[in-house]
A protein has these predicted regions:
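Bacterial Sec-dependent N-terminal signal peptides
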Residues: 1-31
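N-terminal, Lys/Arg-enriched amphipathic/low-complexity engagement segments
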Residues: 66-68
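Surface-exposed extracellular loop regions of Gram-negative outer-membrane beta-barrel proteins
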Residues: 122-129, 133, 288
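Phosphate/ribose-recognition catalytic cores of enzymes acting on nucleotide-derived substrates
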Residues: 104
């Protein structure tokens, strides 16, 4: 069964490469991609706690992690996809990763003023206190947001973002309405040095930013009164002068009781400030 699934993964990867190769024939189109297959074979080594029983009750004698991804661009348009296979996941990776399929795909249009992306999105607001989606293949982590993102740049130095969608949770269906939450967020950032002509060449640098994110998830807990809409907001300031830099950010989130925090109804807060100095060959950062 594993061999057949692996063959299906390799065949699907080959078909993707062939199909995207045809698109690359279009003049001015660019295509790039990569693939990787990691494997482990396990042998009994009681010195590090690997026994016949642990192999039998664990993932088995071997583990395989594989992926292939393709990105295509033509003018203002870009698109891509990633196909993954865990047959089964290697030791140290979550067993819920086991499976084969198209894990990620997206299509995006950006003309400099407005950008629209449909599909799986990776982004963050500020330092990522209240919204951050990213993928780290070596750790088996991926919390991409499948939905829509719009970025609008009405004038020089001003960037507005809006996102909407559902986050990836292993191979769980995005269509599930009760078990999957919907994430909605907006973010704005104003770079004063770009917006104000008198500050274009100034040694003093300043930017302001703010975000709001809400999560909706139906309450299916028969015991606790869980809020279905949970909101969080964030504000940040970045300042600099010459070789010095200062940044501060504050985030607040209303109560979000769940099994992960033992159903506490306390609100959450986060604060980060940093002072930095840098020159050629030397740099220092102080953070609180």
């Amino acid at each position: 069964m594993i061999i057949l699934t692996m063959k299906r993964f390799l065949l699907s990867l080959a078909l993707v490469l062939c199909a995207t190769g045809l698109f690359a024939q279009i003049e001015n189109a660019q295509i790039n991609g990569s693939f990787q297959i990691d494997g482990q074979y396990y042998q009994v080594d009681e010195g590090i706690g690997i026994t016949e029983e642990s192999i039998k009750n664990g993932v088995g004698k071997f583990g395989i992690n594989g992926f292939g991804k393709i990105n295509y661009s033509l003018g203002n348009f870009t698109a891509g996809l990633r196909y993954e296979a865990y047959l089964p996941p290697m030791s140290g990776f979550d067993k819920r990763l086991q499976g084969v399929g198209l894990a990620n795909y997206y299509a995006s249009y950006d003309n400099g003023t407005i950008s629209v992306t449909l599909g799986d999105i990776y982004d963050q607001f500020g330092n990522g206190f209240i919204f951050r989606t990213y993928e780290e293949w070596s750790l088996g982590f991926d919390n991409s947001l499948r939905g829509m993102r719009v970025i609008y740049r009405p004038t020089e130095g001003v960037t507005l973002k809006a996102v909407y969608g559902k986050q990836r949770y292993y191979w769980s269906s995005y269509a599930a309405t009760e078990s999957r939450g919907v994430v909605r967020g907006i973010d704005g950032e104003w770079d004063l040095n770009q917006s104000i002509s008198a500050m274009n060449d100034s040694k003093f640098r300043a930017s302001l930013g703010g975000s709001f994110v809400s999560k909706y998830q139906k309450n299916t807990n028969p015991t606790y009164n869980i809020p279905e809409n949970v909101g969080a907001f964030d504000g940040r300031i970045n300042l600099g002068y010459g070789r010095f830099g200062f940044t501060t950010e504050y985030a607040y989130k209303i109560n979000d009781p769940s099994a992960f925090n033992n159903y506490t109804y306390h609100e959450g807060q986060a604060f980060l400030s940093s002072l930095s100095y840098s020159q050629k060959g030397f740099g220092v950062i102080l953070q609180v």
